[in-house]
Amino acid sequence: MEAAIVDQQISDAELDIMKIIWANEGPALFAHIMDSLAAKGKTWQKNTVIMLLSRLKDKGYLKAKKIGRRNEYIPLVSETEYQTFQTKKLLDKVYEGNVKGLVSNLIQSDLLTGEEYRELKKLLDGGR
């Protein structure tokens, strides 16, 4: 994965497209993106998707490669990089960088299932 600037905010619609490309685990053709959106109940016009892909390219999240008459879209930011950026942003904005506050909130607000709690505890214990 090429280094990219991840600090560009993306819209929910742009994130929907990135999730499709990330799930593809490699370059995605425009037709695949359109089919995947339709399967998720998103009946966006072709021009709307083209505009969203263009914005993602401008923001450094994607690059397009011409294959004959088709475009292949390649992610420049991995899903993990994006998740890390968003988690840090939430941590800084809402919890003022206090990881303990975030984890405490997750546990005390019953947002975690029993299995998720055990997995988190194992991670925090360092696998001990």
State where each predicted segment sits.
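Short alpha-helical segments that sit at the start of domains
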Residues: 1-20, 24, 81
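Short acidic, hydrophobic short linear motifs in intrinsically disordered regions
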Residues: 27-37
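Short, positively charged loop/turn segments that connect secondary-structure elements
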Residues: 38-49
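Alpha-helical DNA-recognition elements
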Residues: 55
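Glycine-centered, phosphate/nucleic-acid-interacting loop/turn motifs that mediate DNA/RNA or nucleotide
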Residues: 60
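Short beta-strand "wing" residues that participate in macromolecule-binding interfaces
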Residues: 63-64, 114
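Short, cationic-aromatic polyanion-contact patches
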Residues: 67-85
